[in-house]
């Protein structure tokens, strides 16, 4: 989508080795967003 873009730093000591899929709170967001990726990946969040 369009709008502001920010660098996101997601820190979670309990990430499983095969990755993660969890709800992500985005400031100013009014919709549910889920971040999906593997441990150690950069995360792309699409609106």
UniProtKB/Swiss-Prot annotation:
Highest taxon, organism lineage: Eukaryota
Cofactor note: Binds 4 Cu cations per monomer.
Any one GO molecular function term: hydroquinone:oxygen oxidoreductase activity
UniProt main location, coarse: secreted
GO biological process: lignin catabolic process
pH dependence per the entry: Optimum pH is 3.0 at 70 degrees Celsius with ABTS as substrate, and 6.0 with guaiacol and syringaldazine as substrate.
Activity regulation remarks: Inhibited by sodium azide, SDS and mercaptoethanol, but not by 4-hexyl resocinol, L-cysteine and dithiothreitol. Activity is inhibited by the heavy metal ions Cr, W, Sn, Ag(+) and Hg(2+), but not by Pb(2+), Fe(3+), Ni(2+), Li(2+), Co(2+) or Cd(2+).
EC number: 1.10.3.2
Record domain Plastocyanin-like: where: 2-47
Compartment(s): Secreted
The protein's assembly and partners: Homodimer.
Name listed for the protein in its UniProt record: Laccase-2d
Organism lineage string: Eukaryota, Fungi, Dikarya, Basidiomycota, Agaricomycotina
């Amino acid at each position: 989508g369009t709008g502001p873009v920010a660098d996101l730093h997601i820190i979670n000591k309990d990430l499983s080795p095969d990755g993660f899929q969890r709800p992500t709170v985005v400031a100013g967001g009014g919709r549910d967003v889920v971040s999906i990726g593997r441990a150690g990946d950069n995360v792309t969040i699409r609106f």
